[in-house]
């Protein structure tokens, strides 16, 4: 089986490349300069291209990555399946406190450029009228080897290592997490074998900031403080019944990986 990964140098894409290769399948990972020049069948496309950490300062790159390249690939290339990697952030939009730009269709919720671009990408997939196009909304991903400090868990472990954690969200905040091993398996099978066009991807592991911080304090003897006026974000459990039924998916429980991950990332 042949796969093509766009965004193969990113956190998810790079891991996915190694995983699929280890399964014995062919993986084509075009360089950015070749994104718009492919004229062959790309097999099973997994679209991991995206901007996450500094998107507020990279508006043009964000739209280019989440929408413009997607438009080109759906319109101009041939493929056996196409899986657009979106975000579970869209399941939990934040309540708006500002009233500057407040489109009525979005009700009382914030409409930041990240969510807007992902929604545009999803809408394009749905209305492309192309066969076998899927959308996968992925929750917060945990890679026990990721010391980039560019996501919440990696960053907070780096802070613990230095001796002091400064929280930008409350201890009561809870989010959905998935181990990257589980994610890689699901992204490999959804394109070729998925029967639906939309999937929520999670693992029934909801973890609070409090649980993470308490473990890090025990592991590193660090201190922690919360910034003023921090917000509490409580995500509800993501419905993953479709991926459990279709792919015999049995998610790895946090009891297996959470503490080991915190130990490794805080070294």
Segments the model singles out, each with a brief description of its role:
Residues 1-23:
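N-terminal Rossmann NAD(P)H-binding glycine-rich loop of SDR-like oxidoreductase domains
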Residues 6, 45-49, 82-88, 136-138:
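SDR active-site strand-loop-helix element
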Residues 123-175, 180:
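NAD(P)-dependent short-chain dehydrogenase/reductase
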